Structures are given as C-alpha cells and as structure tokens.
C-alpha cells in the first residue's frame, strides 16, 4: 500500500482536483458524526493546498453546487441522503465527479437486507436473518432463529437503533424501537466471538482491526464516545486466517460493487468461521474512526488517506 501511494503522491498535483466540495452534515440520524468527519477532511485537504468549499448539506445544495462552480465532490455524509445513492445520482446528473462508490453500490450497501441477499446468492457467509413487520414476525423469528438475536434498522448506520435481545418479549420491544428509525427492520442470529473491521482503499484491503468493547456490542457509544474500546492491529489471527479474511472482504466488496474506499464488518464464530455483517461506503473519519487507524497501519497518515480517496475520484470518474 505504501509503495502504491508513494507512486501516486509523487505525481499528484492537488491543483488538478480543481474546486472540491466537501459534502458533510446533512439531515440523517448520523449528522453529528458526519460533521466531525467533515471537519477533519476539510482541514486535511485545506492543509494540502486543495481549493475546498465546505457544504453542510441542506435544502440549498443544488444552488450551492451550481453557484460555487464545483469541479468534484468529496462525499463524507453518513446515512440516508448521502450514502444511499441519492447524492451520487444528483452528482451524476450534474456531471460532477465524486468520491466513493457509485449509485447502485451505494444504494445496495445502505440496504442491509439487499446486501445480505446478494451475498447469500453468491455463497458468501452472512448470519441467518428475518424481516420484522409485526409482533407475529417477532414470534416466528424467535422460533426459527433462537436466541440471542440482534435487531437492526435496515437503512441506518453507526449502530443506531440496534439492540441485542434474549427473549421474545425483548424482541418485540426492540423491533418497536428500531421501527422508529426505519420502516424495515431486520433481526439476525447473534454470532458469539470476536469482531473485525476491514477497510478497503483504491482496490486494496488494509490491515484488519480486531475490536474489543465492554459494551454488549460495538454500539454508537463504543464507536464515537467511549475511551474503553480496544483496537488490535495486527488483529491476532494467524497468517492463514488473516488471508482468508482479506480474501473474503475483497470478494464481498466486489459483489456489491464497492469503489474507492469502504469498510466491512465481520464476526468470527466459536468454530473460527467468518460471518459478514454489513459494508459501509462512506465510513467515519473522526478521531475514533477505524479507516484512518487501518491506513496508519498501512503507512498512510490522515492527509495521505484523504488525498488517496480524492485521487480515486479522478481515476474512476475523471
């Protein structure tokens, strides 16, 4: 990774990026995280000499993009309206190149159910699941999947609305809570074992990170607030298992069509088998975030990481 980036950096002219809009903030439930990510990206690009226009995305976005004469966009919006294909579609219509995955991959990755269906169709391991739309669905899932289970809104990130449940009564309550965030709610089998997160950048898989938290799972607090979350790089797997995880990550990303950069969350069960949970096409870039951590392990500082992401928009979209 370092040598590949060094080659890129040696020929990189930041002026060639033109006027870059950093799109951040927005109206999703992940707005606060996006504001922090955006501030870090804006600082890194500005320090590197890039001509940056910071746009906290609101109702005036179209007018801003047109009046500011934007040449390309760095999308650091998290959640709906930024990560789900809609922003990518707008930028495509305006002819503005942008970072990250395209319309289809963004929409697929934002939809946890569709992501799982694609992976299942290709024999890529992902936990058994059910869709919840009623109390009777909860009871049926209890019977078919057993406990413990984890409940998730289908289109939210940052672990928003998620809950681990150990009984049918808890499942009904968790479904009702998750439904406040999303009309579509999933429940998955709980995988007992360590969790890993793996970042991808410019077609390469970065060093996997093993996660440890005293929380029930790697929730919003553990991701962005708590100081007791543990991160291990190297991840502690033997070389064969780590390569298996890297290969599985590449295969899973190819199945969805991930471009530029992203991050995959994976569990390992007590038998050593890996299970894919979800993929994130615009991961966090805060001081607690995992992609910058993985990039550092690969030899890239934060500014180099941000420039590499932006440079990929030139390679893929001109």
Swiss-Prot record:
Mg(2+) 2 binds at residues 278, 280. It is found in: Cytoplasm. Its cofactor is Mg(2+); Mn(2+). ATP binds at residues 142-197. Mg(2+) 1 binds at residues 265, 278. Binds 2 magnesium or manganese ions per subunit. Its EC number is 6.3.2.4. Cell wall formation. Belongs to the D-alanine--D-alanine ligase family. This is D-alanine--D-alanine ligase. It comes from Pseudomonas putida (strain GB-1). The lineage of its organism: Bacteria, Pseudomonadati, Pseudomonadota, Gammaproteobacteria, Pseudomonadales.
């Amino acid at each position: 990774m370092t040598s590949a980036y060094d080659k890129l950096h040696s020929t990189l002219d930041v002026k060639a990026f033109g006027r870059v809009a950093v799109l951040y903030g927005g109206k999703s439930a992940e707005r606060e995280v996006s504001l922090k990510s955006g501030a870090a990206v804006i600082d890194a690009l500005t320090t590197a000499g890039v001509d940056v226009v910071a746009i906290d995305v609101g109702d005036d976005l179209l007018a801003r993009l047109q009046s500011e004469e934007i040449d390309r966009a760095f999308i650091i919006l998290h959640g709906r309206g930024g990560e789900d294909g809609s922003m990518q579609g707008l930028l495509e219509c305006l002819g503005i190149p942008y970072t990250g995955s395209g319309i289809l991959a963004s929409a697929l990755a934002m939809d946890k159910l569709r992501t799982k269906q694609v992976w299942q169709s290709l024999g890529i391991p992902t936990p058994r699941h059910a869709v919840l739309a009623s109390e009777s669905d909860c009871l049926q899932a209890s019977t078919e999947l057993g406990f413990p289970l984890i409940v998730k809104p289908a289109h939210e990130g940052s672990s928003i609305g998620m809950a681990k449940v150990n009984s049918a009564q808890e499942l009904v309550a968790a479904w009702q809570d998750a439904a406040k965030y999303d009309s579509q709610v999933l429940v998955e089998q709980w995988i007992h074992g360590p969790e890993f997160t793996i970042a991808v950048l410019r077609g390469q898989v970065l060093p996997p990170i093993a996660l440890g938290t005293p929380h029930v799972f790697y929730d919003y607090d553990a991701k962005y607030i708590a100081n007791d979350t543990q991160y291990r790089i190297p991840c502690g797997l033997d070389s064969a298992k780590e390569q298996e995880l890297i290969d599985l990550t590449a295969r899973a990303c190819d199945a969805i069509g991930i471009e530029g950069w992203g991050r995959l969350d994976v569990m390992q069960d007590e038998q050593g088998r890996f299970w894919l949970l979800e993929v994130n096409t615009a991961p966090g870039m805060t001081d607690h975030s995992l992609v910058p951590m993985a990039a550092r392990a690969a030899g890239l500082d934060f500014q180099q990481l941000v420039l590499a992401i932006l440079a990929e928009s030139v390679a893929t979209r001109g």
